[in-house]
Structure formats: C-alpha cells, structure tokens
Amino acid sequence: MIQKNWQELIKPSKIEFTSKGRTQTNLVAEPLERGFGLTLGNALRRVLLSSLRGAAVTAVQIDGVLHEFSSIAGVREDVTDIVLNIKEIAIRMEGDGPKRMVLRKQGPGAVTAGDIQTVGDVEILNPEHVICTLDQGAEIRMEFTVNTGKGYVPADRNRAEDAPIGLIPVDSLYSPVKKVSYKVENTREGQVLDYDKLTMTIETDGSVTGEDAVAFAARILQDQLGLFVNFEEPQKEVPAEQVTELAFNPALLKKVDELELSVRSANCLKNDNIVYIGDLIQKTEAEMLRTPNFGRKSLNEIKEVLASMGLHLGMEVPDWPPDNIEELAKRYEDQY
C-alpha cells in the first residue's frame, strides 16, 4: 500500500489567486499538511525568482558613441546612466531572439521606452520609463538587441568576441518575477487545528501574470522531482461486470488539463468550460478562435496535440456527454 504515503496526505481545498493591478498577485493555499507550507513556499519562491524565462536588452549601439564612458552633446545623462536606464526596460517577447529595436528622437524632451520602434512580437511593458533627456536641437539614435533567457546575465557575458566597435553590452535582467514573499500560518480543517495556510505575494514585470508564473514554477518542480520516482503505481483492476461498452473512444473521457498544454491555452479552455477531450473535439476551429484570448498559436498547439492522439476538431461524438461522465472517467482512467 505504498500509495498511502501520498494519497492520505491532505491537499488544499482552496487555492485562490487575487490580482492587485497588472503586476502583483496574492496566492492563498490551504489546508496543507504541517510543514508543507514552508516546504512548498520556499521551493516555489526559489524557482519563481531564478528559473522562469523572460526577455531583456542585451546590448545597445548609440550613434556617435564608441564606449559606455562617453557623453553625448545635448543629452543631459552620460552614457553610463543611459545604459543603467536601459536595463530597466520591461519587455515581453514571443519566440526566441535575438531581435532588433530602433529608437530615434529629437529634442527637447524626455526619451522614453515608448519611443522605441518594436518589431511585431516584441512589446514594451513600461513605455513611460525614461531613458534620457534631450536639450533643444539634440538628436539621438539607438539600436537595441533583445534576447530571451533566465536569471541575471552580466554585461561581460553579453559581449560577443566579434562585436563591432560601439556595441555596448548591457546587464540582462531576464526574470519576469521581480519579488516573491510568503508566510505560513496555522489553519483548521474540521476539528484539526494544526494545518498550514500558505500565503504568497508575487510581483512581476507584467510580461506574465502571477498565476501563470506559479503554474510555470510548479511545472518545473514537477518535472525535476519526477526524476526521483523509481517505481510504477499499481494498476487498478476493474471488475468485468463494471466494464461498459462505450459508443465512443474512452480517451475522450480524459480531462484537457492532462494534455500538458501551455498555460494560456489551458486557461482559455477552462474559461470556456471545456473539461474533457470529448468536449474539445466537438468544437470547430471557428468556434475556438471566438474564445477570448485564444489565438492562432493556441489553436495550432491544440490541433497538434489532438493529431498525436488520432483526433481533430469538428468531430461528432455519439451519446456525448454521458450522464455518469465522472464515474466513467474514473473507471477508464487506466486505459488511456
């Protein structure tokens, strides 16, 4: 009965996310076994701060500037200060880099991140952020290199051996999560008073929501810890008299949250009340694209996953949904 080691541990009946603006999210999870609040809180915090991928400027080239210790006529800040300001530009980028962005501005006035001319899959999240200030008649042109990565990469590691003269490497702050704190309190479940309640506050740069960041971090931990599981769980035997002949493929009883979709795709399906694969395959492509926040990228991802199972969108499923769908899903879970 090795399953009792994990099956009989209490799991949170409440996992609640509350957003406070665009960049801050609170998470409450309770009840947890005593000690698990600290275990999970510390593990999630470390992964959130160190292991999530993001985008950042890795280098900048400024017309007329050969190195970071220069000054520019008509610009109040020196190049060192400008580079420090460039480090704070918050960026969301789809796909991999490197990508190029250009900024051209004439004075007088402040030069902000919103003045940068971005390419289609790059978005500036803090357009009001000031990069430098121009005097009357001054002009500046910059070209930025943007890439994806994780954690913090110092400027000297962003310096390519064949870099042209005037290309200034920048410290890259890739992590989309800027700050994480947590606390553990006592909570009760029935008559038991010594369970844990975990409360976390996650602050991001806006390129990812706090809820998605926690989901990514949990998936990383799941992937790493799974390597230590050195056994197969015993299969449940279904009595012959309980086996019912279905009019459809039992795989349709599998829940869509088991498909390992991206967080965006999974959330779109959840918001559209699509629970089982049988619900999903009856949707047409046009119906899916009308789902809020569901785009062509998510559609292609779902089509690819379904194709690997021999399924596709727009299928007709007889006798769907069955009245006892939850019971059937549990009965057939070992068959798919």
UniProtKB/Swiss-Prot annotation:
Organism: Chelativorans sp. (strain BNC1)
Name of the coding gene: rpoA
GO CC term (a single one): DNA-directed RNA polymerase complex
Family label: Belongs to the RNA polymerase alpha chain family.
Protein name stated in the entry: DNA-directed RNA polymerase subunit alpha
GO terms assigned for molecular function: DNA binding; DNA-directed RNA polymerase activity; protein dimerization activity
Task of the protein: DNA-dependent RNA polymerase catalyzes the transcription of DNA into RNA using the four ribonucleoside triphosphates as substrates.
Gene3D superfamilies xrefs: 5' to 3' exonuclease, C-terminal subdomain, DNA-directed RNA polymerase, insert domain, RNA polymerase, RBP11-like subunit
Enzyme class: transferase
Lineage start: Bacteria, Pseudomonadati, Pseudomonadota, Alphaproteobacteria, Hyphomicrobiales
EC number: 2.7.7.6
Substrates-to-products reaction catalysed: RNA(n) + a ribonucleoside 5'-triphosphate = RNA(n+1) + diphosphate
Coiled-coil regions listed: none
Alphabetized UniProt keyword annotations: DNA-directed RNA polymerase, Nucleotidyltransferase, Transcription, Transferase
A Pfam cross-reference name: RNA_pol_A_CTD
Region (Alpha N-terminal domain (alpha-NTD)): 1-232
